[in-house]
Amino acid sequence: MSLLTRLCKGNVPLRLNTLKHLSQCGYSSHAKFSEHKPIEKIRNIGISAHIDSGKTTLTERILFYTGRIAEMHEVRGKDNVGATMDSMELERQRGITIQSAATYTLWKDTNINIIDTPGHVDFTVEVERALRVLDGAVLVLCAVGGVQSQTLTVNRQMKRYNVPCLAFINKLDRLGSNPYRVLSQMRSKMNHNAAFIQLPIGVESNCKGIVDLVQEKAIYFEGDHGMDIRLDEIPQDMRAESGERRQELIEHLSNADEKFGELFLEEKPFTEKDIKEALRRTCIQRTFTPVLVGTALKNKGVQPLLDAVLDYLPNPGEVENLAFIEHEGKEPEKVVLNPARDGKDPFMGLAFKLEAGRFGQLTYLRCYQGVLRKGDNIFNARTNKKVRIARLVRLHSNQMEDVNEVFAGDIFALFGVDCASGDTFTTNPKNHLAMESIFVPEPVVSMAIKPNNTKDRDNFSKAIARFTKEDPTFHFHFDNDVKETLVSGMGELHLEIYAQRMEREYGCPVTLGKPKVAFRETLVGPCEFDYLHKKQSGGSGQYARIIGIMEPLPPSQNTLLEFVDETVGTNVPKQFIPGVEKGYREMAERGMLSGHKLSGIRFRLQDGGHHIVDSSELAFMLAAHGAIKEVFQNGSWQILEPIMLVEVTAPEEFQGAVMGHLSKRHGIITGTEGTEGWFTVYAEVPLNDMFGYAGELRSSTQGKGEFTMEYSRYSPCLPEVQEQIVRQYQESQGVGQAEKKKKKN
């Protein structure tokens, strides 16, 4: 019995439009997705933006218009269903996206793989992972908020991975929306060569449709959910502005594209085809950013955005993807991967995300070269472990669909593969190729954590093991001195979300302590060492001598630790060098000034001595311990603290109070701007001074102010702050003040 007959027999009131939508572009079209498509018919895109710019709502509309879902739900809708891509219960409750969700859909016979990413700065590694494996992105901007702090972060990440992007100015229906201001911010703050390819026909409550500057047509979205598109002439009152903006678009394109520039200089008329080809070339080369407009919530502008994804963003064959062959002591050799979907070259894939699913660990991969079929064997390039492919799946948020094979350009997932995020997989282990891994920022906040009930310890350790494996920015360690379990992450929200997930997913309620800043210790200047470790206790003893220098790294590398072997000859036999490095890295875990990790230091081993019988790797490891203690006594040390980029937005009448509070917290104001009764201030503030700021800002701005912050860098802290940290550490260690009069710089 057909679906239609069954529904009618049950006297279910039907809306013919819904059925029409289901039958036309629903299930049948997605059977076509699994057909083997040529590379030109594939797009891998991400949807990224600042928090609350409407990314998830936009993805929901895209899935609806392409027939992937039969009805739409809002992020914070009254029906409590939540958006399709926010599959975690916590995401639906808070109305924010925490994890990247992957899905696929079909538009005009082209496969589109979409990853919806979080906008909150605490989940920035999710964005980092998504952009690493995508060929193009849609950067969503709020027509009211414009370019905000996380927009700048996403922009930097896109630049790092060379991802071409389209800009979509969303929320035209919001009070105070001003897409023209957003465009000028894109040019000034993000240095984008950007211009409108669409204009809004009215904003706020008067938002009627859009003008397409390429086709020179007005587009209106009618019928249920804006599904019927009507093309019309440009309204009379917008013709002058449309002409000016089209000319501006042509000028920007002629500056960015040589071929188009020649046509411009020859003053030949431009066809729609000329403009589209120039837009595609410049967008792929990242020399121009096309700007589209719309309102996802009010169902306007989404279908033209999908057309733009097909027209202007690259297919996997138009993006150069590299793998590297490591050579000891030399620069890695670059190898360009073949994106052809013919399976002639061996399979190469990158694991970009891990997740604990219902059936074991789920590993998300992007196939860059070759073909992978069920039953194939693949090898992990890092561990050389062989894995047999029992099941290949394609993802739609938290649902999955089995497939028999995947080709270059596809995004898919595997079950039961033991690996880390950023691992490379190949069917030919002899080629020694590895793909560049994913950049992972250092955690900046730590909190003590403990289960409320001792009987939950097993579940607690299971949760910690899973979350640390899934998220490389979530760290865990046990502090022996204070006998506390510590978790570290990118911010308070990051750690709170994991605490709530432990209770929700593992039935293990936990208590979080006060946030602690991840300080670091570093040297101020170079310090030489010459240390002899000698121990005789009958039988074979221990003998090791090491000579060298410990020196600070440049400020841009002050979160790193380096070990350099500069020895010549056999005074320190090569088999003992790893022992010295191990000793150095062990000691770097805990500094002697404040108990924090050492960083920004290079350990140069230059010479030493050994004994034919008594020397061992252990002896050289202990010699490294002694050498670092010697450098601690003789060298000058300082404490580094994380500096945050803070952006505060509030009504203009509170500007003085906001600036005063930031200065009181040792903030350095880097810029301000104001518009329509509101101002935004940008500052660099030590993270240690930012705790409790949310409450202070609320009370000083009558609840109207809001702020965002993200990690910027590590920087030396003020002398009085260093003194206080050292004193607190000494008191916690029970060291008398009289005994510790020695002051460190």
From Swiss-Prot:
Cellular component terms per the entry's GO annotation: mitochondrion; nucleus
Name of one Pfam family that matches: EFG_IV
Lineage: Eukaryota, Metazoa, Ecdysozoa, Arthropoda, Hexapoda
Residue positions binding GTP: 49-56, 116-120, 170-173
Coiled coil spans: none
Family: Belongs to the TRAFAC class translation factor GTPase superfamily. Classic translation factor GTPase family. EF-G/EF-2 subfamily.
Signal peptide: none
GO molecular function, one term: GTP binding
SUPFAM superfamilies: EF-G C-terminal domain-like, P-loop containing nucleoside triphosphate hydrolases, Ribosomal protein S5 domain 2-like, Translation proteins
Pathway: Protein biosynthesis; polypeptide chain elongation
Subcellular location: Mitochondrion
The protein's role, per its UniProt record: Mitochondrial GTPase that catalyzes the GTP-dependent ribosomal translocation step during translation elongation. During this step, the ribosome changes from the pre-translocational (PRE) to the post-translocational (POST) state as the newly formed A-site-bound peptidyl-tRNA and P-site-bound deacylated tRNA move to the P and E sites, respectively. Catalyzes the coordinated movement of the two tRNA molecules, the mRNA and conformational changes in the ribosome.
Protein name: Elongation factor G, mitochondrial
Predominant subcellular localization, coarse grouping: mitochondrion
Species of origin: Drosophila willistoni
HAMAP family named among the record's database cross-references: EF_G_EF_2_B (MF_00054_B)
UniProt keyword list: Elongation factor, GTP-binding, Mitochondrion, Nucleotide-binding, Protein biosynthesis
Domain tr-type G: 40-317
Highest taxon, organism lineage: Eukaryota
Biological process annotations from GO: mitochondrial translational elongation
PROSITE patterns recorded: G_TR_1, G_TR_2
Note: This protein may be expected to contain an N-terminal transit peptide but none has been predicted.
